[in-house]
């Protein structure tokens, strides 16, 4: 019904045929790079390319520059804070392919968050994770929202996540309804 397409449009990955999409006061796709973090539903990693959790997260910092920058101490400190907050600090030097699906999802969330985005786009962030991990991730998203980050997520698990959300926007066959969850 267009949920992923909407997220990818706000990210600037889908060409807008008519009208404009604005993120943080900037028109998407017009040469500007708004401060957006993105966690796709199914992340693709070349499993023949052995990268550690630390390396994957620090790749998020490099997304804004054309070359791989050497991570600064502040980047490493922020990375460790994110990994600890997401409950995966012990896996810092672990190859990502050795993690469970839920742990990998949290690594990709940390990669998006290390950019300190003003808008965080998440495509099915709670799919394939256990109930405790789902609740931990949702509590983190609520905290981020309180800190001024706009969080936009798509989900098929509306009943599971609605209790954590201040506002819900539902798209069903082109019809949009929004408001506080009831």
Model-identified regions with their sequence ranges:
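H-loop/switch region of ABC-family ATPase nucleotide-binding domains
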Residues: 155-156
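Catalytic Walker B motif of ABC-type/P-loop ATPase nucleotide-binding domains
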Residues: 120-123
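Conserved switch/coupling elements of ABC/ABC-like ATPase nucleotide-binding domains
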Residues: 173-177
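Conserved ABC ATPase "signature" region
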Residues: 58, 72-91
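Helix-to-loop junction immediately C-terminal to a conserved catalytic motif
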Residues: 11
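Conserved ABC transporter NBD signature motif
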Residues: 19-32
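Conserved ABC ATPase signature
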Residues: 95-99, 103
